[in-house]
Amino acid sequence: MLAPIYAEIQGEKNKAVGAPLADFEMNDMDGKAHRLSDFVGKGQYTLVDFWASWCGPCRAEMPNVKACYEKYKDKGFSIVGISFDQDLQAWKDATTQLGITWPQLSDLKGWQCKAAEVYYIRSIPSTILFSPDGKVIATNLRGDELGDKLAELLDK
């Protein structure tokens, strides 16, 4: 009975501002295993973007995410996408259609994926912005909020 409550509390702690990276492993589109720590805490700000091909709001937000990526990718900003898809081909097709060029990971388990468990993600789109040393500095930045935060951090 307490397990779901504990999972929620732990997930919320894992994405609290100041929390260190809570690591997990998922595969890329070619089936190669990666840890989130392969991308986060490597000396640049990293946005972890939780999304899915079937999520209309996720797809609607993607042009903004792309614009931020293009503006700041050479200034110390990276993105890693975590897909909540269950269909590999739908995931691949969506990244092509949306022009997503940053790394993508998924275990193709939908809402039962490891990322949803570790960070207690219950709705998408959802984001976590990590500092260069791998600590959470913001969550759920969308629209102008993402661009404003990146400008604050990287337009120096």
Where are these regions (language model features)?
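Oxidative protein folding and maturation machinery
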Residues: 1-34
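Structural microenvironment flanking redox-active thiols in thiol-disulfide oxidoreductases
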Residues: 60-98, 110-117, 148
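Generic structural signal for well-ordered beta-strand positions
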Residues: 34-35, 137
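Short, small/polar residue-rich loop motifs at catalytic or cofactor-binding pockets
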Residues: 20, 44, 122-124
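Thiol/disulfide oxidoreductase modules built on the thioredoxin-like
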Residues: 100, 107-155
